[in-house]
UniProtKB/Swiss-Prot annotation:
Site (Lowers pKa of active site Cys): K141
Compartments, record wording: Cytoplasm
Protein source organism: Syntrophobacter fumaroxidans (strain DSM 10017 / MPOB)
UniProt keyword terms in alphabetical order: Acyltransferase, Cytoplasm, Transferase
UniProt protein name: Octanoyltransferase
Residues reported to bind substrate: R77, G78, G79, D80, V81, T82, Y83, H84, S144, V145, G146, G157, I158, A159
Pathway per the UniProt entry: Protein modification; protein lipoylation via endogenous pathway; protein N(6)-(lipoyl)lysine from octanoyl-[acyl-carrier-protein]: step 1/2
GO cellular component entries: cytoplasm
One Gene Ontology molecular-function label: lipoyl(octanoyl) transferase activity
Catalytic activity: octanoyl-[ACP] + L-lysyl-[protein] = N(6)-octanoyl-L-lysyl-[protein] + holo-[ACP] + H(+)
Main location (coarse class): cytoplasm
Keyword flag Transport: no
Length: 228
Protein backbone atom coordinates (compact mmCIF):
# COMPACT_ATOMS: atom_id res chain seq x y z
CA UNK A 1 0.00 0.00 0.00
CA UNK A 2 1.32 3.44 -0.93
CA UNK A 3 2.00 5.86 1.89
CA UNK A 4 -0.24 8.91 2.12
CA UNK A 5 1.24 12.28 1.11
CA UNK A 6 -0.21 15.77 0.74
CA UNK A 7 0.03 18.19 -2.19
CA UNK A 8 -0.90 21.86 -1.70
CA UNK A 9 -1.21 24.44 -4.45
CA UNK A 10 -0.89 27.70 -2.51
CA UNK A 11 -0.89 30.18 -5.39
CA UNK A 12 0.77 33.53 -4.67
CA UNK A 13 2.16 33.58 -1.12
CA UNK A 14 4.57 35.85 0.73
CA UNK A 15 8.02 34.26 0.94
CA UNK A 16 8.37 34.48 4.71
CA UNK A 17 4.90 33.08 5.24
CA UNK A 18 5.70 30.06 3.07
CA UNK A 19 9.02 29.62 4.85
CA UNK A 20 7.26 29.61 8.21
CA UNK A 21 4.79 27.02 6.90
CA UNK A 22 7.66 24.85 5.69
CA UNK A 23 9.34 25.00 9.09
CA UNK A 24 6.14 24.05 10.89
CA UNK A 25 5.52 21.16 8.51
CA UNK A 26 9.15 20.08 8.86
CA UNK A 27 8.92 19.99 12.65
CA UNK A 28 5.75 17.87 12.50
CA UNK A 29 7.15 15.58 9.80
CA UNK A 30 10.24 14.84 11.91
CA UNK A 31 7.99 13.45 14.66
CA UNK A 32 5.66 11.78 12.14
CA UNK A 33 2.59 13.90 12.91
CA UNK A 34 2.11 14.78 9.23
CA UNK A 35 3.00 12.78 6.11
CA UNK A 36 5.31 13.88 3.33
CA UNK A 37 3.96 17.16 1.96
CA UNK A 38 4.76 19.20 -1.13
CA UNK A 39 3.94 22.89 -1.50
CA UNK A 40 3.48 24.48 -4.93
CA UNK A 41 3.77 28.23 -4.63
CA UNK A 42 4.52 31.50 -6.39
CA UNK A 43 6.14 34.42 -4.59
CA UNK A 44 6.05 38.20 -4.89
CA UNK A 45 9.42 39.72 -5.80
CA UNK A 46 11.99 38.41 -3.29
CA UNK A 47 15.74 37.82 -3.25
CA UNK A 48 17.05 35.04 -1.03
CA UNK A 49 20.58 34.31 0.14
CA UNK A 50 21.44 30.68 0.90
CA UNK A 51 24.15 29.36 3.19
CA UNK A 52 26.84 30.39 0.70
CA UNK A 53 25.01 33.65 0.03
CA UNK A 54 27.04 36.81 -0.17
CA UNK A 55 25.60 40.29 -0.52
CA UNK A 56 28.43 41.02 -2.94
CA UNK A 57 26.34 39.02 -5.43
CA UNK A 58 23.69 41.75 -5.25
CA UNK A 59 24.08 44.22 -8.10
CA UNK A 60 21.53 46.67 -6.70
CA UNK A 61 22.04 48.74 -3.57
CA UNK A 62 19.94 48.10 -0.45
CA UNK A 63 18.31 51.49 -1.05
CA UNK A 64 17.31 50.59 -4.61
CA UNK A 65 15.92 47.22 -3.53
CA UNK A 66 13.93 48.88 -0.75
CA UNK A 67 12.57 51.43 -3.21
CA UNK A 68 11.53 48.59 -5.52
CA UNK A 69 9.86 46.77 -2.64
CA UNK A 70 12.09 43.70 -2.96
CA UNK A 71 13.11 42.15 0.38
CA UNK A 72 16.41 40.29 0.78
CA UNK A 73 16.04 37.24 3.03
CA UNK A 74 18.87 35.15 4.50
CA UNK A 75 17.75 31.51 4.57
CA UNK A 76 19.02 28.09 5.61
CA UNK A 77 18.95 26.40 2.20
CA UNK A 78 22.09 25.47 0.32
CA UNK A 79 23.35 27.54 -2.55
CA UNK A 80 23.96 31.23 -3.04
CA UNK A 81 21.66 34.03 -4.17
CA UNK A 82 18.48 33.68 -6.22
CA UNK A 83 15.42 35.66 -7.22
CA UNK A 84 11.79 34.62 -6.75
CA UNK A 85 8.88 36.40 -8.35
CA UNK A 86 5.60 36.22 -10.25
CA UNK A 87 5.54 33.68 -13.06
CA UNK A 88 7.91 31.30 -11.27
CA UNK A 89 6.74 27.86 -10.12
CA UNK A 90 8.36 26.97 -6.80
CA UNK A 91 8.21 23.44 -5.38
CA UNK A 92 8.91 22.88 -1.68
CA UNK A 93 8.93 19.17 -0.74
CA UNK A 94 8.90 18.31 2.95
CA UNK A 95 9.95 14.68 2.57
CA UNK A 96 11.51 12.13 4.92
CA UNK A 97 14.49 11.13 2.81
CA UNK A 98 15.60 8.16 4.91
CA UNK A 99 12.10 6.64 4.78
CA UNK A 100 12.17 7.21 1.02
CA UNK A 101 15.55 5.49 0.67
CA UNK A 102 17.08 8.63 -0.83
CA UNK A 103 20.54 10.05 -0.32
CA UNK A 104 20.95 13.82 -0.56
CA UNK A 105 22.45 13.47 -4.03
CA UNK A 106 19.62 11.17 -5.14
CA UNK A 107 17.06 13.66 -3.85
CA UNK A 108 18.56 16.65 -5.66
CA UNK A 109 18.75 14.58 -8.85
CA UNK A 110 15.07 13.67 -8.42
CA UNK A 111 14.13 17.36 -8.17
CA UNK A 112 16.10 18.07 -11.33
CA UNK A 113 14.42 15.09 -13.04
CA UNK A 114 11.03 16.51 -12.07
CA UNK A 115 11.80 19.80 -13.82
CA UNK A 116 13.35 18.07 -16.84
CA UNK A 117 10.12 16.06 -17.14
CA UNK A 118 7.99 19.20 -16.93
CA UNK A 119 10.07 20.91 -19.61
CA UNK A 120 9.71 17.84 -21.82
CA UNK A 121 5.93 18.20 -21.60
CA UNK A 122 6.36 21.62 -23.23
CA UNK A 123 8.75 20.32 -25.90
CA UNK A 124 11.84 21.75 -24.21
CA UNK A 125 14.99 19.68 -23.66
CA UNK A 126 16.33 20.41 -20.19
CA UNK A 127 19.63 19.08 -18.92
CA UNK A 128 21.84 18.92 -15.87
CA UNK A 129 25.13 20.77 -15.62
CA UNK A 130 28.03 18.69 -14.32
CA UNK A 131 29.48 21.63 -12.41
CA UNK A 132 26.40 23.44 -11.12
CA UNK A 133 23.12 22.07 -9.80
CA UNK A 134 19.80 23.08 -11.27
CA UNK A 135 18.34 22.61 -14.75
CA UNK A 136 19.68 24.19 -17.92
CA UNK A 137 18.53 24.60 -21.50
CA UNK A 138 21.56 24.90 -23.71
CA UNK A 139 23.86 27.28 -21.87
CA UNK A 140 21.07 29.10 -20.01
CA UNK A 141 19.65 28.25 -16.61
CA UNK A 142 15.90 27.75 -16.23
CA UNK A 143 15.56 26.26 -12.73
CA UNK A 144 17.49 26.73 -9.49
CA UNK A 145 17.69 24.18 -6.71
CA UNK A 146 18.51 24.85 -3.08
CA UNK A 147 17.52 22.51 -0.28
CA UNK A 148 17.83 22.21 3.46
CA UNK A 149 17.75 18.88 5.30
CA UNK A 150 17.51 18.41 9.04
CA UNK A 151 16.98 15.05 10.76
CA UNK A 152 16.57 13.55 7.30
CA UNK A 153 13.56 15.71 6.45
CA UNK A 154 13.87 18.13 3.54
CA UNK A 155 12.55 21.61 3.01
CA UNK A 156 13.13 24.44 0.51
CA UNK A 157 13.37 23.02 -3.03
CA UNK A 158 13.44 24.07 -6.68
CA UNK A 159 12.21 27.10 -8.66
CA UNK A 160 11.28 26.94 -12.35
CA UNK A 161 11.00 30.06 -14.49
CA UNK A 162 7.73 29.89 -16.42
CA UNK A 163 6.58 33.41 -17.37
CA UNK A 164 9.07 35.11 -15.06
CA UNK A 165 10.23 38.64 -15.91
CA UNK A 166 13.89 37.76 -16.39
CA UNK A 167 15.02 41.37 -16.06
CA UNK A 168 14.84 40.98 -12.29
CA UNK A 169 17.70 38.48 -12.42
CA UNK A 170 19.81 41.44 -13.48
CA UNK A 171 19.70 42.53 -9.84
CA UNK A 172 21.90 39.58 -8.83
CA UNK A 173 24.64 37.25 -9.98
CA UNK A 174 22.24 34.31 -10.18
CA UNK A 175 23.31 31.47 -7.87
CA UNK A 176 26.58 33.34 -7.36
CA UNK A 177 27.65 32.60 -10.94
CA UNK A 178 28.81 35.63 -12.87
CA UNK A 179 27.62 35.84 -16.44
CA UNK A 180 24.93 33.17 -16.18
CA UNK A 181 21.94 33.89 -18.40
CA UNK A 182 18.53 32.88 -17.09
CA UNK A 183 15.73 31.74 -19.34
CA UNK A 184 12.08 30.72 -18.98
CA UNK A 185 9.51 28.47 -20.59
CA UNK A 186 7.69 31.42 -22.17
CA UNK A 187 10.90 32.87 -23.56
CA UNK A 188 11.86 29.56 -25.14
CA UNK A 189 8.39 28.95 -26.58
CA UNK A 190 7.80 32.53 -27.64
CA UNK A 191 4.45 32.57 -25.83
CA UNK A 192 3.06 32.53 -22.32
CA UNK A 193 2.10 29.31 -20.58
CA UNK A 194 -0.57 29.10 -17.91
CA UNK A 195 0.29 28.36 -14.32
CA UNK A 196 -2.36 25.64 -14.25
CA UNK A 197 -0.65 23.82 -17.15
CA UNK A 198 2.68 23.91 -15.34
CA UNK A 199 1.19 22.81 -12.02
CA UNK A 200 -0.58 19.86 -13.66
CA UNK A 201 2.70 18.79 -15.18
CA UNK A 202 4.54 19.19 -11.87
CA UNK A 203 1.90 17.08 -10.09
CA UNK A 204 2.17 14.37 -12.76
CA UNK A 205 5.95 14.09 -12.50
CA UNK A 206 5.84 14.31 -8.73
CA UNK A 207 3.61 11.23 -8.72
CA UNK A 208 5.92 9.54 -11.22
CA UNK A 209 9.11 10.13 -9.24
CA UNK A 210 7.83 9.84 -5.67
CA UNK A 211 5.42 6.93 -5.31
CA UNK A 212 2.87 7.96 -2.71
CA UNK A 213 -0.87 8.17 -2.33
CA UNK A 214 -0.86 11.88 -3.19
CA UNK A 215 -3.88 13.71 -1.79
CA UNK A 216 -4.61 17.36 -2.55
CA UNK A 217 -5.15 19.55 0.49
CA UNK A 218 -5.92 23.22 1.10
CA UNK A 219 -4.03 25.60 3.36
CA UNK A 220 -6.89 25.77 5.93
CA UNK A 221 -6.92 21.96 6.10
CA UNK A 222 -3.17 21.87 6.76
CA UNK A 223 -3.37 24.71 9.28
CA UNK A 224 -6.04 22.77 11.16
CA UNK A 225 -3.81 19.70 11.19
CA UNK A 226 -0.79 21.67 12.39
CA UNK A 227 -2.80 23.37 15.13
CA UNK A 228 -4.42 20.16 16.35
Amino acid sequence: MLRKAFLLNLGMLDYNRSRDLQKRLHARRVIDVVPDTVLLVEHPHTITLGRRGNRLCLKASPEDLERMGIPVVQVERGGDVTYHGPGQAVVYPILHLRESGLSLADYVSALESLVIGVLGDFGIKGRRNGKNRGVWVGGDKIASVGIAVSRWVSYHGIALNCTTNLEYFGLIDACGLKGVEMTSISRLLGKDVSGSEVHRSIAFHLRRLFERDWQERTLPEIEALLND
